[in-house]
């Protein structure tokens, strides 16, 4: 479990993962060494799993993002999972309950590239595609408290 100070530190790092120990110390009322120790323990317990850079896919020519619902053909579940893992344009994928087995997000440079990727996948699964127009809520954590 985490306490209120841990949650405060995590929240601050979620807003800006480059925030200095000095700034985190001022925010929390702890010393910099105490903050460093708390963060080390949170990392050790894998509460904090990493630090990342948010990049705009369009900067690399990926003009379209899509959500793909994927339903493997009979006997193809493992192959479909392997295919998704090996196609680098898939940026996220969740195995889910319900009619579909996977819901995935992918970034492509064009509709033609999307068609090619889906044509290859359709040998193993049925797919349903929705082009993302806007993301009003970016990936985030639920409230910690």
What do the predicted segments below correspond to?
Residues 1-145:
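A compositional/biophysical signature of low hydrophobicity enriched in polar/charged and small residues
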